[in-house]
Amino acid sequence: MILEHVLVLSAYLFLLGLYGLIMSRNMVRALMCLELILNAVNMNLVTFSDFFDNSQLKGNIFCIFVIAIAAAEAAIGLAIVSSIYRNRKSTRINQSTLLNK
């Protein structure tokens, strides 16, 4: 695959996730946009690892670590969101004043 095509796709995914993260008012949607950003970073890691140093798998191994961290982040984030929803009956970011106290 051509390097430029993958980089353009990765940049598009990153910008789409960044736009969604900035504009979203729902916590679950913000978590999904954060996952899009992390997947764009993973695409870059694997692409550059394959393109510049094909004999070593450092980018692929680091990508696996990022996926594991993203899974833990998603699990903790969804647990926090479900706890906030149980207490506040809303998952909107601008209505949550839990951290202001």
UniProtKB/Swiss-Prot annotation:
Alphabetized UniProt keyword annotations: Chloroplast, Membrane, NAD, NADP, Plastid, Plastoquinone, Quinone, Thylakoid, Translocase, Transmembrane, Transmembrane helix, Transport
GO BP: ATP synthesis coupled electron transport; photosynthesis, light reaction
Top-tier EC class: translocase
Gene3D superfamilies for this protein: 1.10.287.3510
Record EC number: 7.1.1.-
Listed transmembrane segments: 2-22, 32-52, 61-81
Keyword Membrane in record: yes
Subcellular location: Plastid, Chloroplast thylakoid membrane
Disulfide bonds: none
Keyword Thylakoid: yes
Catalyses which reaction(s): a plastoquinone + NADH + (n+1) H(+)(in) = a plastoquinol + NAD(+) + n H(+)(out); a plastoquinone + NADPH + (n+1) H(+)(in) = a plastoquinol + NADP(+) + n H(+)(out)
Subunit structure: NDH is composed of at least 16 different subunits, 5 of which are encoded in the nucleus.
HAMAP family membership: NDH1_NuoK
Function: NDH shuttles electrons from NAD(P)H:plastoquinone, via FMN and iron-sulfur (Fe-S) centers, to quinones in the photosynthetic chain and possibly in a chloroplast respiratory chain. The immediate electron acceptor for the enzyme in this species is believed to be plastoquinone. Couples the redox reaction to proton translocation, and thus conserves the redox energy in a proton gradient.
Protein's recorded name: NAD(P)H-quinone oxidoreductase subunit 4L, chloroplastic
Gene name in the database record: ndhE
